[in-house]
Amino acid sequence: MVHYEVVQYLMDCCGITYNQAVQALRSNDWDLWQAEVAIRSNKM
């Protein structure tokens, strides 16, 4: 996946903004799955 598709996936699956998705990816060394887990655990 290219960068935009990864960000779009996080926005769609987690209901977050573009900036939140990018920040989550940056915080997790651009690992999509780690970023998704981090977002989901923060929302709980």
From Swiss-Prot:
SUPFAM superfamilies: UBA-like. It comes from the Bacteria. Pfam families: UBA_4. Induction: Constitutively expressed (at protein level). InterPro entries: UBA-like_sf. This is Uncharacterized protein YdaG.
